[in-house]
Each structure stands twice: as C-alpha cells, then as structure tokens.
Amino acid sequence: MEINTRVGVEGHSSSNTVKKRIPIKVKEGNVNGLRELVKKMTTTQKDAFRKEYGNLLNLLEIEVQTPAIIALAQYYDPPLRCFTFQDFQLVPTVEEFEQILDLPLEGKTPYNYLGRYTPILTLAEIMKIHPVKLEKKVTVKGKVMGLPKGYLEWYLYQLMKKERWETFMDVLALVLYGVMLFPNVENFVDYAAITAFVAYKTQSENPVIAILAEVYGTFDQCYELKRKKMLCCLPVLYVWFVSRVSKGTLNAICPVEELLHCKPKLREPQEWVQLCADLNEEKVN
C-alpha cells in the first residue's frame, strides 16, 4: 500500500466532512450458480485450479458490501488517480493486487491488449467444443460481442456431469474473468475478458496490471463521463479497501483468506459513509 500524507491541500479539509460527489450504483454480478458448481470440486481439484489460476476461487466466495465501494468512490481524485481522505491519500498498488490475486508478476509478461480479439478457433480449442457450435452462441449485448453467462454455466454443468474436470477448470476461469475481473455487461462474458483470459492461458500473460488499470479507468468514467453503474473488479477492490481499514489484514499472506476467515462486520450504508469520513492516517493499516 502507498500512503501519501497531504496536510493542508487546497480543496481538501482536515475535518471529517462526509463527501458525496457522484451518484453511482455498484452492481455485483450473480455468482451463486458458480459457487454451487465449485462446491462439486474436490480439494485436489481446487488446489490444482489455484496453482494455475491464482486466487479466483477465494475471490468468488467474497461477499462484497457494495455500500463500501460507493462510499470509497466519493474520495476518488481523478487528476491524481488516488483516494484522497482528510490528511492522506490511499493508492492501490500493483504489489497489493498481485497479493490479492495470487498472481506474481515476476518472470511473467504483463497482459497488454493489442487490438485483436481472440479467434473463435482458439477459444473453441480451449473449451473443447466445435468452433461452429461455439460461434452460434456468440451474441451481442450492450454493443459488445461475447458469450452469455447462462450458456457458459450450462456448459460447465455438462462438463461436470461428464467429469471433464480439466476443461471444466479452464471454462470456469474464463467465466470468472468475465463476471469478476473484467465485467462490462451484466451476465455476459465479452470478448475483452475472453481475450485477457486466453492471453493468460496460452501465453502466460499476467493480468494484474490490466486489472488495476481497469479499476482506475472505471472510476475515471464514473467522474468524467458520468457513468452511473460500476461493475469492475469488485471483489478485488473490496478486499483491497477493507484490508486497509480492518485490523490484522495487512500482513496476512493472503488478505482474501483473512477476510473469509474473519468475516468483516456487515455495515449499513451510512456506517461506511461515516467510516470514510473519519479515516485519517492513523486509522489505516
């Protein structure tokens, strides 16, 4: 975590004034069906999944308190791309996101979208499905192309019944990229998310920096374009924020597992608002 002390900065009072600048809605995707499917996996299978795809399964279990994200968003400082509170700034870092996602960058190439989406043949090979059959499932939603989450969940169920667990884990990771890491349209895995997943699967390109950039980009859109709905990377952002304002999480080997273990207090929306208003440098980890 990076904390910058900014005492007496113009435009930022040192009093604990409640801020409300942007009326945004934070929408977490429905992942209950995916959670039920994961319950069918053995411990060995879950361990194999984590070894290949990092902390996605633990992030799937995180119950995001969306009022926390709404309250945090009011302190986003677009020109500085950080969260400015009373007398300090919070800046999510690559190192923190590496830890949360359990995807170390060392020795890996960062994912960088090069302007071309994944060919259907490549995706079909990963999903072990005929390209023509898969192409028929590709649709357009919200002006973007991709695959419906409902279809992918159905396909996961078929793979589970046939005990094709290796393919099941690949398709599960694909869906989690679409609904949890790079969501754009509700209940839909678009080609941007598919391309990021395939780059990781086939080229070992690490998505951590892209996810952090997506967080910043989403907040920028909320402010500059008056975009009122926020879907992006909510479990990752929530874990980062709560681990900064909850005791005993900063030095955890994995803050996700720590949060699952300690079950953060369920707060009312106004409690999150006041928590952010009262934050100062002494109250953060």
Could you say what each language-model-derived stretch is?
Residues 1-285:
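Structural stabilizers in ordered domains
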